[in-house]
């Protein structure tokens, strides 16, 4: 990561462990964002196949959460970070939780489409509101 403030420790391995936590977090965030985009697209376009892919994709996001949690707990146990490093690790742990929740909500959107067998489609106004909500979430 260019211009990163992570580093400057005597142990290069420690710097790399902290950097890896952030990199994994960003990868997870990108996956969850794609999952949400796909869920919105599937819902608006009534695309059951894409909705099923969103549901199936949730496992990847959940696996990232477990992996990052274990990585951060390992850092806490072995390195006993202080000050800035501790705040970084705790921020990653909190963010992972929030990102995983976004993935869960995207899955719920997909499941709602898959369960709706009535063929009822949202009105144009409802679709516009849904697009607005989706755009706000992406910010």
Task: Give the label of every model feature segment.
Residues 1-139:
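Cytosolic, long alpha-helical scaffolding segments
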């Amino acid at each position: 990561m260019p211009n990163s403030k992570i580093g400057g420790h005597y142990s290069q391995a420690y710097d790399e462990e902290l950097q890896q936590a952030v990199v994994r977090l960003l990868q997870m965030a990108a996956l969850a964002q794609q999952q949400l985009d796909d869920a919105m697209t599937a819902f608006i376009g009534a695309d059951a196949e894409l909705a099923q892919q969103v549901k199936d994709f949730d496992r990847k996001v959940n696996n990232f959460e477990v992996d990052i949690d274990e990585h951060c707990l390992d850092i806490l146990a072995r390195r006993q970070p202080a000050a800035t490093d501790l705040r970084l690790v705790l921020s990653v742990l909190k963010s992972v939780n929030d990102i995983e929740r976004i993935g869960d909500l995207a899955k719920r959107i997909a499941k709602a489409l898959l369960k709706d067998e009535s063929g009822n489609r949202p009105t144009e106004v409802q679709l516009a509101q849904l697009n607005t909500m989706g755009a706000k979430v992406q910010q």
